[in-house]
Amino acid sequence: MQLFHLCLIIFCSCPTVQASKLCLGWLWGMDIDPYKEFGASVELLSFLPSDFFPSVRDLLDTASALYRDALESPEHCTPNHTALRQAILCWGELMTLASWVGNNLEDPAARDLVVNYVNTNMGLKIRQLLWFHISCLTFGRDTVLEYLVSFGVWIRTPPAYRPPNAPILSTLPETTVVRQRGRAPRRRTPSPRRRRSQSPRRRRSQSPASQC
């Protein structure tokens, strides 16, 4: 397995220092968090279950459809664009390496181990990275961070004391902000009905004819 990581470092031609540090962190267990500079953390992302993240193919299609021009531009756009470029390049190199290893390994069991490791471990890391940066570009970084906190609070709350449905990122500002939960709309108390005057009615003066 260490040989596999070493091959990853050699073949992962990431263009920036941050991506290179990410690869080195996987090899030597360095405490490098790729989300730290964006206000998040690996631990915060870990609250989301693995099946929450779309497939790499779907995420790449989304990135291409929404941000292809910015990703291919030679100019610097945002740190999220840069990190997204790095993740896409690393995944491409990783697939090239996995194909090379698969084609050159004669042992089917060893080949399956490599493929499963890439898809299960490395694939999940890439899916998390792609989802995070695409979401930051789509919804805004503050909204994504607030969503991660809201989901973390929701998932750690016992089922009996939390809403049945998890927060949804696209509707976060309207419905899933933690501080807005539990507030019922204030009803206007009806004003008391105006009581009638208790003063006795004035008697109508009787005509002399009625007194006869």
Swiss-Prot record:
This protein's name: External core antigen
Which GO terms label this protein's molecular function in UniProt?
DNA binding; RNA binding; structural molecule activity
Renumbered to this chain, region (HBEAG) spans: 25-27
- Cross-referenced Pfam families: Hep_core_N, Hepatitis_core
Modification after translation is described as: Phosphorylated.
* Annotated compartments: Secreted; Host nucleus
Q: Which Gene3D superfamilies does the record cross-reference, listed alphabetically?
A: Viral capsid, core domain supefamily, Hepatitis B virus
Q: Which residues form the signal peptide?
A: 1-19
Q: Got a GO cellular component term for this one?
A: host cell nucleus
Q: Which UniProt keywords apply?
A: Disulfide bond, Host nucleus, Host-virus interaction, Repeat, Secreted, Signal, Viral immunoevasion
Functional note: May regulate immune response to the intracellular capsid in acting as a T-cell tolerogen, by having an immunoregulatory effect which prevents destruction of infected cells by cytotoxic T-cells. This immune regulation may predispose to chronicity during perinatal infections and prevent severe liver injury during adult infections.
What is the predominant subcellular site recorded for this chain?
Answer: secreted
What organism, scientifically named, is this protein from?
Answer: Hepatitis B virus genotype H subtype adw4 (isolate Nicaragua/2928Nic/1997) (HBV-H)
Please report the residue spans annotated as repeat (sequence).
184-190, 191-198, 199-206
Describe, as the record does, how this protein assembles with itself and its partners.
Homodimerizes.
**GO BP term, example:** microtubule-dependent intracellular transport of viral material towards nucleus
Specify where the region named 3 X 8 AA repeats of S-P-R-R-R-R-S-Q lies, as residue ranges.
184-206
Q: Which residues form the propeptide?
A: 184-212
- Superkingdom to which the source organism belongs: Viruses
Q: Family per UniProt?
A: Belongs to the orthohepadnavirus precore antigen family.
Segments carrying the region annotation (Disordered) are 165-212
Stretches with biased composition (Basic residues): 180-205
